[in-house]
Regions:
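Vicinal oxygen chelate
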Residues: 3-4, 98-142
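A short, acidic/glycine-rich surface segment
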Residues: 35, 66-72, 111, 115, ...
Length: 142
């Protein structure tokens, strides 16, 4: 049986070094790198990282922007048209992420409490940036 429920499939982030970006997301958030070997072999245009069974982040090199033709003006989106993306973690993984970022001296926002999201009010959340300036929000609900 096929589940045709509407859901998020992927988000594309512009990055300067897709391989380094994949490593960042793997090391800090535990996202599984996909197609990195194929990207370095130049058989695919970009690698991705798997967030969960149904959702991925595509890590598109900024150099690809000039070839974007699917929508007028798409090539101009190589700036930062995405405000931020949010990942929901367990409380344990949330604390572990914050510790990993702190160990690497990656700047983070203060903790917020009760921020609204897809599953209601989060117990805690915070923001940090990836090496390309994309803003990531981490949160947990339980």
């Amino acid at each position: 049986m096929t589940d045709n429920t509407t859901r998020l499939d992927h988000v594309v982030l512009w990055v300067s070094d897709p391989v380094a970006a994949a490593g960042f997301y793997e090391k800090n958030l535990g996202f599984e790198p996909l197609r990195v070997g194929e990207y370095t072999a130049e058989t695919v245009s970009f690698p991705s990282v798997r967030i969960d069974d149904e959702t991925i982040l595509d890590l598109a090199p900024r150099s690809m922007a000039a070839r974007m033709r699917m929508l007028p003006g798409a090539d101009a989106s190589a700036g930062h048209p995405v405000n931020h993306i949010c990942v929901s973690l367990s409380a344990h993984d949330f604390d572990a992420l914050r510790a990993r970022l702190d160990e690497q001296s990656i700047p983070m926002s203060d903790l917020s409490h009760g921020a609204y999201g897809a599953r209601g009010s989060a117990r805690r959340s915070f923001y940090f940036g990836d090496p390309d300036g994309n803003i990531i929000e981490a949160r947990h609900y339980e």
